[in-house]
Amino acid sequence: RIWEMTAKRGPIGLSRMKRLLELLGNPEEDLKFVHVAGTNGKGSVCQFIASMLRAAGYSVGVFTSPHVMEYNERFDIDRNYISDDDFCRIATYVMSFAEQVNDEGYGYFSEFEILTSTALLYFKEQSPDIVILETGIGGKMDMTNVILNPLVSVITQIGFDHVDMLGDTLAKIAEAKAGIIKEGVPVISESSELEVKDVISDVAKEKNAKFIDASLAKYSINDYSEFMDFDFEFSDGTDKVKMDGVRISLIGEHQIRNAITALLAVKSMRDRMLIDIDESEMREGLTSARNMGRFEILKNNPYIVIDGSHNPQGLKAAMETLKKLRETIFKNKRIITVFGCFGDKEYQDMTEILRSGLTAVDANEVIVTEPVSPRALKAEKLKKLLEDENIAVTAISDEETAFDRA
């Protein structure tokens, strides 16, 4: 029913969402939020923050997107997904009011608006101590940006994605993401590009919000295998943090940066006495954090890894991780890759990154397939883009058949 109702799109803006939440009793006003935006790393940062807060004894709601297997994954309280009954009940209730708002002339709702409203109402019912809220697209005009006073704002790595909606330069995209920054609320950002930093810093100044630049952190890696072990030090003139032997289960150097960003967000809340958490709880939370589908090792005999990279920046990080693991746990292993993507993504850049990355690790075979979506890029077209004298490429349109072949 959600798909049927959201087949048409209304005008861009928050007025429709605000009206719907008003009819629902403004559930967002009764919740405490951590707001997370960015192009890549949002989901992992959300899980790192949530895991640290849980380790300190807090009940934590997490709203993220997209899901890997089912809608329920997007609505998480203390690692328990919303039940089918609760999801259907609340979403149906939300849609009844959405129809009223549409009739009032506000326009049609998007799927994300319905799901965000469902999440806010669900979290109000369940009353977690803190909700980690991940944006969908952008920040300023994102449907999660109806919240007024988060505990802290976080902006992860920024790259080129949704350029038709956010802009075709990093500065324009950064400006859209920086729209989540609120008056007087600290913002942590890990983007190292100067043009991105300048935009976020300028918006923070306008909003009297402290800007904490996570890219200033220096780290060294002690172990890079089925887990990451690292030392890090952060100093920006006013804040200082130093921790050795930090261990995380999310794999890849980019996950170290995500972990540091999350830790600085938690530290910001602690320093302002919004939460009570010590270093041992932070360490425990970082170690126990999980994020489905982010270079996730499902099995190790043989190794089966899934990764949901959906843009060039994310895929590049996955290829860098694969290259590092080729030197350790994947040494002397055959590498067979199953790959599919959407036709409305930057698939040409992604296929070039994939080809280069797989060549670098002497991959044995690539099986290209099609996601179950009308947006899927045809496997035969993908095969032509990927074909290389160094790698065997096979096209199998059905996902399950492709995986069975691998």
Task: Mark where each language-model region is.
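C-terminal helical cap/extension that packs against the catalytic core
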Residues: 193-203, 208, 212, 303-306, ...
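N-terminal leader/targeting and accessory segments in enzymes
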Residues: 1-40, 44-59, 69, 127, ...
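Acidic, Mg2+-coordinating active-site environments of NTP-dependent enzymes
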Residues: 101-102, 126-134, 150-245, 259-280
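ATP-dependent carboxylate-amine ligase catalytic core
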Residues: 14, 21-29, 55-148, 164-166, ...
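Active-site-proximal loop->helix
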Residues: 66, 70-90, 164-180, 201-202, ...
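Nucleotide phosphate-binding/pyrophosphate-handling subdomain across enzymes
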Residues: 130-135, 141-154, 158-159, 172, ...
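Hydrophobic alpha-helical packing residues
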Residues: 49-54, 123, 269, 386
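Beta-strand->loop->alpha-helix junctions that form or flank phosphate-binding loops
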Residues: 63, 190-191, 203-225, 248-253, ...
